Amino acid sequence: VGDTPGFLVNLGGTAIGTEGLRIMQEGRATPSQIDAVMRDSCGFRMGPFELMDLTGIDVNFPARKIIYEGFFHDRRMTPSPYHESLYAAGRLGRKTGGGWYAYDAKGAKVDPGADHPTSTVPASSVVIMDTHNKKLVGLIAADGAKMLGADDGKSPILVAPIGKDCTTTAIELGLDPKRTIAVDLTGDTAKRLTIMTAPGAD
């Protein structure tokens, strides 16, 4: 391993932590939701916020700053002000009884918060833009919804983008962003299905 800012493990986990913090900072998901997705869909033992609390905010926030500065402020490694605020407040994770989560004297989480949204009534029909996507078609078939190959102007429109958000995908495909739902099929969908909508979606 060559000489580089941060230990190898810090660099390996940088993307997971910084992306998790960015998603939370943008209000897309809570720490408990992000951690649950990483555990259930990606096979990790714990998510980025659980890991930060375990190792200690007093360890991982300074390390993140060193890596960011060492790579000449590469924007992909930008620290989060929320991370810094926990550090400044002395909420250092399990060792202080609170970080991203609150902990009891034994180190167990106290009311971690819901890791999934409240259930809603499923749609009776959906529009699938890529009917050749066997995984997406299989999920809808298992749910019992009627699959439409063309837009009827009122049903939810399902897409399965990789590396793009819901809004960008809807615009590129000429779809109604208010009815478009992006489904993440890159991970394990047996325990959890992660979806994304555009701002202002119905």
Locate each region found by the language model.
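NAD(P)-dependent Rossmann-like dehydrogenase/reductase catalytic/cofactor-binding core
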Residues: G2-F7, A15, R22-A190, D202
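Acidic, glycine/proline-rich low-complexity segments that act as flexible tails and inter-domain linkers
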Residues: L193-T194
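Catalytic alpha/beta core domains of metabolic enzymes, predominantly
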Residues: T197-A198
